[in-house]
């Protein structure tokens, strides 16, 4: 019974790794920038007004975020955006 439980745990871990490993690989691109930095600006679905920053491929640019939805290429400051997305 201990062997069956061990094999089940190994199988579960293997499936978990097969699902998460490709996502981890695709998160970083060849130049070292994180994948979210390549997403377009997305103001989201709500109508609130927050000045945020997104990386446009070369620099960080200000945009208006509605407060809900959107994507993760959204930073509260230009400094945070540059730290995460700019080439070293």
UniProtKB/Swiss-Prot annotation:
Cellular-component GO terms for this entry: extracellular space
Report the Gene3D superfamilies cross-referenced here.
Pancreatic trypsin inhibitor Kunitz domain (4.10.410.10)
Prosegment residue ranges? 28-33
Q: Which positions make up the signal peptide?
A: 1-27
Q: What is its main location?
A: secreted
Q: Which domain of life is it from?
A: Eukaryota
Q: Which Pfam families match?
A: Kunitz_BPTI
Q: Which cysteines are joined by disulfide bonds?
A: 37-85, 60-81
* Record-linked PROSITE patterns: BPTI_KUNITZ_2
> Which compartments does it reside in?
Secreted
Residue limits of the BPTI/Kunitz inhibitor domain?
37-85
> Where is it expressed, tissue-wise?
Expressed by the venom gland.
Site positions (Reactive bond for chymotrypsin) are: 47-48
Q: Which GO terms describe its biological process?
A: envenomation resulting in negative regulation of voltage-gated potassium channel activity in another organism
Instruction: List the keywords (alphabetical).
Output: Disulfide bond, Protease inhibitor, Secreted, Serine protease inhibitor, Signal
Q: Name one GO molecular function term.
A: serine-type endopeptidase inhibitor activity
Assigned protein family = Belongs to the venom Kunitz-type family. 03 (sub-Kunitz) subfamily.
Q: What does this protein do?
A: Serine protease inhibitor that inhibits trypsin at a molar ratio of 1:1.
Q: What is this protein called?
A: Kunitz-type U15-theraphotoxin-Hhn1f
Question: What is the originating organism of this protein?
Answer: Cyriopagopus hainanus (Chinese bird spider)
